[in-house]
From Swiss-Prot:
Keyword Cell division carried by entry: yes
A GO MF term: guanyl-nucleotide exchange factor activity
Quaternary structure annotation from Swiss-Prot or TrEMBL: Oligomer of dis3, pim1 and spi1. Interacts with ned1.
Function summary: Promotes the exchange of Ran(spi1)-bound GDP by GTP. Involved in the control of mitosis. Regulates a variety of nuclear events, including mitotic check-point, chromosome decondensation and mRNA processing/transport.
The name this protein goes by in its record: Protein pim1
Organism expressing this protein natively: Schizosaccharomyces pombe (strain 972 / ATCC 24843)
Region (Disordered): 1-53, 478-539
Bias (Polar residues) ranges: 514-525
PANTHER family: REGULATOR OF CHROMOSOME CONDENSATION
One biological process term in Gene Ontology: regulation of mitotic spindle assembly
UniProt keyword annotations, A-Z: Cell cycle, Cell division, Guanine-nucleotide releasing factor, Mitosis, Nucleus, Repeat
Any Pfam family the entry gives: WD40_RLD
Length: 539
């Protein structure tokens, strides 16, 4: 005999528990409440979320969106430690931009990149992170030592380090929208504002640690932070900006780059993110050992190492001014509409909203890109009479329409709105991409090569001894500098230049005259290949 549905649902059933006590199961009438069936509990999402912060602070910053333009990646400089990510194609040095075929638009679809001291990361169109370079402290977010292939054979560590590969683990099913690198650590922001990091921090005594209980980690680990919208890194510290305008810092604080005092014997406390007494911040930046924050009224705050006045703060007491222990207003930047700030080891660059660039700090290797005849009288000389540092933020003459500026240890790159990239500073390892000349580049100079001739550069990164740029290949319109295009015959005049294991041949460089104030002269060079650019090259 079969019973109907209503009969079955109302029939009381009994079951025997483990202790032998009989108990009846609840039928539908037992769980009815106010004549209604219970509401099913919603499934709890397993995806990570930012930490909730008490209070109702208003959001003033947006979580970064994933860029959509797919870019080719070009590398130059020293590659002796796998920094260039060329895989099996080992290269000790590349003098001018060369295509990295592993990261081409049809294979990866890179939309953004980040460069650390000796490693790099690229962000793909689908929000995945690819890393390559030195992995001694797990900055790549994956294991490369003593690894075996599917046949059980050991895989060469250099090959694994030098081949751009995905970061898996906790990021496998997440969508990353921003990635950034320090010297020994990598950090990422997801599309819901979570912050993940991996690697470690170092200090003057060696490895400081990843956390107070862990020396280093190769596994992407979520930080206990509120909703994050921007990250900035120095050599071994991180600054995180929340969507509500708060600033958190952590890492090595020996030079007060964390903006808080710590006893030397308790420096592990610096490995835990802590907020600073700043509010309404809309942008953060960092040099190797100094830090910056910009608030919604355009005021700029700085802290950290200031020995060459890289914080932009002049202090009468020389010893007292060597470090700025807490966030301090940079009066010298009042009146400038600063968009972003970044720094190298001991120098700083600030990008203004109008596309110009300010520079200050150390200048012994032409890090500032300012011609001698345009330097203010406040420039400090060394005992030999050479430029040492400049404490006054000063406009770099002739460099305009800049959309991004990045600093390596002693060199810089600037990307302009017309898709070009300029470099200056130390060329000891050919990190400026100006050919096989290792003399310092005194002023911003156009970077040229056949590989990027028809590429509109969109983003750049500068490391310790190398650089990486990315752009749209086969751009429909050739980028124009100051409204003047290269003459067609320039394409036929190429200067053969040897590189280590590369056959790139650059377009002959143009070298326009420079006036006494550093601006380009209106007189054109005698060379037919010359193009009027915002600055000249250096000998």
């Amino acid at each position: 005999m079969t019973s109907n549905r209503s009969t079955r649902s109302s029939t009381k059933r009994e079951e025997v528990s483990k202790n032998g006590v009989e108990k009846r199961e609840l039928d539908e009438s037992d769980v009815m409440k106010n004549g209604k069936k219970p509401v099913k509990r919603a499934k709890v999402s397993s995806l990570p979320k930012p930490v909730r912060v008490p209070g109702s602070a208003k959001r003033i910053n947006k979580i970064p969106e994933l860029p959509t333009e797919r870019l080719n990646v070009y590398v130059f400089g020293s590659g002796s430690m796998n920094e260039l990510g060329m895989g099996e194609e080992e290269m000790d040095v590349v003098y001018r931009p060369r295509l990295n075929p592993i990261l081409s638009t049809d294979k990866v679809g890179v939309v953004d990149l980040a460069v650390g001291g000796m490693h790099s990361a690229a962000l793909s169109h689908d929000g995945r992170v690819y890393t390559w370079g030195v992995n001694d402290d797990y900055a790549l977010g994956r294991l490369t030592k003593d690894q075996k292939d599917e046949n059980g054979d050991k895989v060469d560590n250099d090959l694994l380090e030098g081949t751009p590969s995905k970061v898996e683990g906790a990021l496998s099913h997440l969508r990353v929208t921003k990635v950034i690198c320090s010297d020994n650590l990598t950090a990422a922001i997801t599309d819901n504002g979570c912050c993940f990091t991996w690697g470690t921090f170092r200090c003057s005594d060696g490895v400081l640690g990843y956390s107070d209980s862990q020396k280093r980690t190769a596994e992407p680990t979520q930080m206990r932070l509120p909703e994050i919208c921007q990250l900035a890194t120095g050599t071994d510290h991180i600054i995180a900006l929340t969507t509500t305008g708060k600033v958190y810092t952590w890492g090595n604080g020996q030079q007060f780059q964390l903006g808080r005092r710590m006893l030397e014997r308790r420096r592990l406390q610096g490995l835990t993110p802590q907020p600073l007494a700043l509010k309404n911040i809309i942008s953060v930046g960092a040099g190797s050992y100094h830090s910056f924050a910009i608030d919604n009224k355009g005021r700029v705050y700085a802290w950290g190492l200031n020995i060459t006045r890289q914080c932009g703060i002049e202090v009468e007491d020389e010893e007292e001014g060597a470090v700025i222990t807490k966030p301090t207003l940079v009066d010298a930047l009042e009146g400038y509409n600063v968009k972003s700030i970044t720094g190298g080891e001991h120098h700083t660059l600030a990008l203004l909203e109008d596309g110009r660039v300010l520079a200050w700090g150390r200048d012994d290797r032409h890090q500032l890109g300012i011609p001698d005849n345009a330097l203010p009288e406040t420039v400090v000389k060394d005992e030999k009479g050479n430029n040492y540092y400049l404490s006054t933020p000063t406009i770099i003459p002739g460099l305009t329409n800049v959309i991004q500026v990045v600093c390596g240890t002693h060199h810089n790159l600037a990307v302009t709105s017309d898709g070009k990239v300029y470099s200056w500073g130390s060329a000891e390892n050919y990190e400026v991409g100006q050919g096989d000349n290792d003399e310092d580049v005194a002023v911003p100079t156009l970077v040229r090569s056949k590989a990027i001739k028809e590429v509109a550069i969109r983003v750049a990164g500068a490391g310790g001894q190398f650089s990486i740029i990315a752009g749209i290949p086969n751009a429909s319109e050739e980028p124009v500098a100051n409204g003047i295009k290269s003459e067609p015959e320039n394409e036929k005049k190429l200067k053969t230049e040897e590189t280590s294991k590369t056959d790139d041949s650059p377009v002959t460089d143009a070298k326009p005259d420079v006036t006494s104030n550093g601006e380009p002269s209106t007189a054109t060079s005698e060379s037919k290949d010359s193009v009027l650019e915002p600055s000249s090259t250096t000998a």
